[in-house]
């Protein structure tokens, strides 16, 4: 989902957790846990998962959605 779509879900309290984890593309992805279960990835408008070069850049995207805390997943 795009940043705008995720902000909408957050505003309606449908997202309960933000997660940054390593990507197979040597970067970091941002996912959000939906209140009904499952993870929702941050994507571009074409539906491709967004990958960031460092943890701080990825974390900033979760903050943009509205979260004040972000869980950073281990690389192992």
Please give the residue ranges for each predicted region.
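A short, charged, amphipathic alpha-helix used as a generic interaction element across diverse proteins
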Residues: 53-67
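Negatively charged, low-complexity tracts enriched in Asp/Glu with abundant Ser/Thr
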Residues: 1-11
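Short aromatic-glycine-(Arg/Gly/Cys) micro-motifs in beta-strand/loop hairpins
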Residues: 21-47, 67, 74-76
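Short secondary-structure junction motifs
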Residues: 15, 67-69
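An N-terminal amphipathic alpha-helical segment
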Residues: 9-27
